[in-house]
Each structure stands twice: as structure tokens, then as C-alpha cells.
Amino acid sequence: MADDQVSVTPIGEPVLSPPSPLNPEIIRVVERLTAEFWPGIPVIPVMSAGATDGLFLRNAGIPTYGHSGLATDVVDIRIHGKDERILVKSFLDGHEYLYRLVKALSSDSK
């Protein structure tokens, strides 16, 4: 910091959690639905720099995944900005995609 009048003191130790395994059954469903909604777009697992409460579930032995289902224009990414927005079509497509994803993953007909 450029100001020696300010100090930062960590409170407690960081909480870590194990990574969730890439379940092939889940990946298959995501790939199938992605191909229906956005043909030609590959499914690539990534790790977000953001944080969630998923670490508490993973530490309890519950695999936890983050997935938005929102398509954004790379030249107009405004996530968490003061002018945050997405296209209406992206919102509606993402809503339907996530609905069908949850329905597929929670049924016996995966």
C-alpha cells in the first residue's frame, strides 16, 4: 500500500476445500444441452477467480459446481460493473437452458 497510515490484518486462516470431481455424467448432459442451445461451442471446465459458498458444501463432501448458462458478447462484458447488463435473448436462453439442465440432472433419464 502507498499509505503507511493504513494497515491490513487478516482475520483467521483461509478456508480451503477440495476440488469437485468432473463427473462424466454431468459433463455429458452439459455438452448435450450446450450443443442444442449454442451449436459448435465447446464445453471447457474452468476455475473462476470469484468466490462462492460452495467450499462449505465441498468440505461437507457434496460436489459443487458453478455454471451460469449465460452467453455474453466478449466486446460488451459488463459483469459486476456499474453498468452491468446482458442481452434479453441471453437472459431468456440462459433461463431455459438452466431450467432444462436442472430438470435433466434431477431426473432418471439423463
Question: Where are these predicted regions, by residue range?
Answer:
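Metal-dependent amide/peptide-bond hydrolase catalytic core
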Residues: M1-Y99, K103-K110
